[in-house]
Every structure is written in structure tokens, then in C-alpha cells.
A protein has these predicted regions:
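A general sequence property marking short-to-moderate contiguous segments
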Residues: 2-12
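Gly/Pro-biased beta-strand-loop elements
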Residues: 10-114
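Exported/periplasmic cell-wall-interacting domains
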Residues: 48, 65-68, 80-170
Length: 170
């Protein structure tokens, strides 16, 4: 069902962007597993059957959940101020998914992005956001740099997951 790449030792490659990084991509967000998977378009098969990168994420908490559905990436910003009833923060590498829901790096309490919450960072993989899809800054930057406006994003639960779990950053 999926085209996969393996290392010389036979283990599955989790990030194949160095050898296969097509311009046309498709993204899934699995709310249950806290995983983002990016697929590349395979012109030989005419489908998005090549998983090229996997990321750990936090989606909305039970009060401000991330809505399931199919969306298109909108605008993108290097940094955006976020506001809620009880918070103001700045998020790096913001890519709009729908309305005020974005892919973005773990937010900072300061505009220079030098102070991120250890709780937020260490909670990646669990539903903790205010509805956005929260990523490491490295992964949010990858989406910002490699995914164009108009790319399809599917958000759901228990989605097919062809890769092993991504490694947590420490």
C-alpha cells in the first residue's frame, strides 16, 4: 500500500526528505496518536503513497479540541502572536490549517522566542493545545519551508500510520 525506504541495515527510514522530497504533499494529523505524517506524491502510481516524514504533535485539549476534517494550508508566517482569554504568546513557523487553527512550534512567552514552556514541550504527543497542532520548532519550520499553500491536511482519529513513532526530541 505504501512505498517505503530502508537504510542499509534494513531499518525503516522515518525521514526520507534527503532522497525524496516532491513538491506535492499530503498531510495527516492523527489526534489519537499525536502524530503528523507527510506523504509525497508518487507520479508512477498517481497517489500520495510515499510517507516522507513523521512528527510528534499536540492537538487541542478536550475543551478546545482540534476539529476533524479535510482542510487546505492557507497563509504562513515566521512568527505570530497568539491570544486567548488567559494567555498571550508567540509561536514560531505558523502555517494556517483553518480559521485560527495552525501548525506551529511550541510557543514562547516572549517575542524573541527564547523562553518556551517546558511543560508544553514535554507534553508533545498529548492533547494540550488550544486547538492548534503544536510541533517542535524544527518540525514547524520544516512544514513552513517545505509545504506550500493549498496542500491538503486531513485531521482525524486512528488514521492509517505507516511509520514507526517519531523520536522525541530531548
Amino acid at each position: 500500500k505504501y512505498r517505503r525506504y530502508r537504510k542499509a541495515d534494513g531499518s525503516l527510514m522515518e525521514d526520507v526528505t534527503s532522497i525524496f522530497n516532491p513538491s506535492s504533499k499530503y498531510i495527516t494529523v492523527d489526534r489519537t496518536r499525536g502524530r503528523v505524517t507527510i506523504y509525497g506524491y508518487n507520479s508512477a502510481t498517481g497517489s500520495y503513497d510515499t510517507p516522507i516524514k513523521s512528527m510528534i504533535c499536540s492537538v487541542g485539549n478536550p475543551i478546545s479540541y482540534t476539529a476533524a476534517g479535510t482542510y487546505k494550508i492557507g497563509w504562513q508566517l515566521k512568527k505570530k502572536q497568539m491570544r486567548g482569554e488567559d494567555y498571550v504568546c508567540w509561536a514560531p513557523y505558523v502555517s494556517q490549517i483553518y480559521d485560527a487553527v495552525y501548525f506551529h512550534g511550541v510557543a514562547s512567552s516572549t517575542p524573541d522566542l527564547n523562553m518556551i514552556s517546558a511543560v508544553d514541550f514535554n507534553s508533545l504527543g498529548s492533547p494540550m493545545s488550544h486547538g492548534c497542532v503544536r510541533l517542535t520548532a524544527i518540525d514547524a519550520k520544516w512544514i513552513y519551508d517545505n509545504v506550500s499553500s493549498g496542500t491538503t491536511v486531513r485531521i482525524g482519529d486512528n488514521l492509517d500510520y505507516p511509520l514507526t513513532n517519531p523520536t522525541r526530541y530531548t
